[in-house]
Amino acid sequence: MLQVEQLHQYYGGSHILRGLSFEATVGEVTCLLGRNGVGKTTLLKCLMGLVPAKEGKVSWEGKAITASRPHQRVQAGIAYVPQGREIFPRLTVEENLLMGLSRFSAKEAKEVPGFIYELFPVLLEMKHRRGGDLSGGQQQQLAIGRALASRPRLLILDEPTEGIQPSVIKEIGAVIRKLAARGDMSILLVEQFYDFAAELADQYLVMARGEIVQQGRGADMEAEGVRGLVAI
C-alpha cells in the first residue's frame, strides 16, 4: 500500500501541495482528478523522488521512502509513466521495452516478458519499428508496457488518455482493468477525462488548489458531484 501523510511542496513563494494525505490500496485503481494547475503532476514527481517533498511522509509497503532517490523507488517496485510518455524515439519498440528491465540483472533483462505483448499486441507487431515512428496512442501503449516490464507493484500513470484516439483509450482502459483484477498491484491514475476515470476508479480523490477537497468510492462519483468539480 502507498501511504501519503501531510505532504507539502513549494515552488518559490507558492505553496503547491498543501498537506495531502491519502492511501492507494493493492488491487485497486485510485483515480486522482483535478483541473489543470492544481498540483497533480507535482504530487507524482514527489512520489517518485524527482522533486523532494518539503514536509510530510511517503510510505510504500510499510517503509518510509520520503528520502529515497528515484532509482531506489524503482527498485522498490514503483513505476511511473509521465505525461508526454518520454519514450526513446530512436530506439526500437523492443529496445524501449528492454529499458524497462533495467532494475533486473543482465541475465533477467535479456528478453521482453511475454505478458507485455499479450496486453499490447500492437507492440509485438511493431517491435522492430522505431519508437518515434509510432502514433501517439501506440507510444502511450509503449510507455505503459515499458513501465510494466519492471514488474511494478505500484503503477503511477499521469493522464494516459491525453491526445489519444478513442479506440486506444478503450484498449488502455481494458489493460488497467486487467492489471487491477490481478490483485497484486496498486494503480494511481491521474486523469482529467472524467468518464474514463469514473469507469475505472475503485477510489477517487479530487484536488483543488493543492489540496484534496473530496474523496470517496468510485461507484459514488456521479452521485457525489465529482463531474462538476473537475469540469473545465
Locations of the language-model features?
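ABC ATPase C-loop
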Residues: 147-148
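Conserved catalytic motifs of ABC-family nucleotide-binding domains
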Residues: 151
